[in-house]
């Protein structure tokens, strides 16, 4: 079978024709339309007007680096208000921005480690430990190219693990029988979430749809990886929940089954982000890899030395800044967007974005705000395929304008912006595709970071950036777009017959985006100790399911449309006990997301982590330590005397947040009573009168860390008036109420409370 061109009618374009198109303002006919680098084929919803088949490079700023002049590992930016820019920007990019882009169908490369898992397990063909081949009709053999091999201990500067070993290959087979395979079955030191990275070698006859299957906590998720690109580095599949120990139920399998003739190759598979292992100045950083700069991740990912260290080992600070763009160019070289760069990996990356925060203070308690940066006057005259550098300025301008619009609409704050700088910055000069730096806010100005540490601010900021990328990409290719919906609300579960429950929810309207309307929903189910399945797409805002007796079922729901998928609802649970005649209702009233406790007087400013550490969306690793200096008179200073200065005792620690999955713990505890059925709902369904409490033998009200903290962007309260009214009515009719929470009394101090 003749191998298709990777890009539409462009890789064979002559130099003269390319030069003739110099300065174009859109990609025009340049569009990658073949198989994406990675595709999750278990995804239940189809994306047609999102970022499907778009390959993006997105990163958070800075990271721990080795300072050769001063002789030690250090942060690139100072510690202020409990964090540093090196830590803070990751808390926007990793939990919010990248998932939004991936939910829209994008394939996102990020040059810094994305996984907050400190453990790392590598299974490789060279070590053979936990690696098992099965050759059927087609036989496995060693490739002619070098591959990955791991050795014990740390790695010297410049040591490339992807040239130290071998890789394996087998001919692809179209028939779904007598399939050859490789099983990667690691031993996990503890139960948890682990990113999964695969590696392989790209060869002349590589297939564009290699079949990978990830087995995780009794579930399986299927991927197709285009091995015609991106060989010889780590390729991210996804992040999954795995059980402790060694089991086939927690493994990765690669087969040679493919709809295309050719070669399937395989090398090592990596589970988890791990600890930094690159030696500089005689020592490693001693921190998880996700806290280090991109320079060290690039080396671990097999990037060439001229990408890892432009300074030839003399200046890690500059190397870290440069390698983000250089690694993007290395991956994208030879694709339709960088057709003249022949020595690359042919990954069709077409856009880069660096998320930073900035310095600067305002003595009048106003905002410093957001700044965009682009480079149009320096670097190559045009970008890849003759694209004008001015398209980057358009991108930066749209990012800044839309951030202000979306933040103002959501929070009515009159957010500040600082226009767009067109200056010579490495992260916008070196990329050979459109690029921008977005300085989110000032980490030195407390009014900025006070909002910036609120998870709802981070979500809204990230959603604005995602929407700008979506619209920008649609315009660059002349396509229509649809904005992914917001998560459903008023989620509830009720019995509709003796052994059947109905899940029901409401769509959430996004008043600022008319296209962000759900047209379907994904319902995810986890039974007992198993992980969540890959979901079922349904058209209506409800779903009926029969329950097996004695098993706790856990559910979550997302909203979908042609543009992608929303974030999920909280996890709700249900249980059917054989012979049960009464039902308990668990009400989840714990939805709070907040920054730490705020200190803001005429003389002091900052975060008091001891009084209240705040609640992130899930776990977060963005804190350096407790703030020590609250003296407002020292605003804008540097060093220990500066306002905001603090410690580093929390560096590398992943701090728990609101996981929105505590109903399942209550359901599992109640299961042992053995004589009750269980259903659950969000507290808003009770407040709005959508749940008849009188049907239930007991209401278990889960408040968690819910409270009115006085500073959050959204209002939270243990017992809101509507909830109190419904519970009072229930109790007056001899209902039984069990309440748990950290602030159920202290949050009710009003005269009418």
Question: Where in the sequence are the language-model features?
Answer:
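A glycine-rich, often tryptophan-bearing local segment used as a flexible ligand/cofactor-contacting loop or short
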Residues: 692, 705-753
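Pro/Thr/Ser/Gly-rich low-complexity, intrinsically disordered linker/stalk tracts
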Residues: 472-515, 549, 563-582
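Beta-strand-rich modules
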Residues: 544-565
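Aromatic-Pro/Gly-enriched surface loop or interdomain linker
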Residues: 81, 96-104, 112, 281, ...
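A short beta-strand element within beta-rich, extracytoplasmic domains
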Residues: 180-204
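Active-site microenvironments of hydrolase-like enzyme catalytic domains
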Residues: 291-389, 421-444
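Active-site-adjacent mobile loop/cap segments within catalytic or ligand-binding domains
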Residues: 251, 257, 268-276, 351, ...
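Extracellular carbohydrate recognition and processing domains
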Residues: 217-246
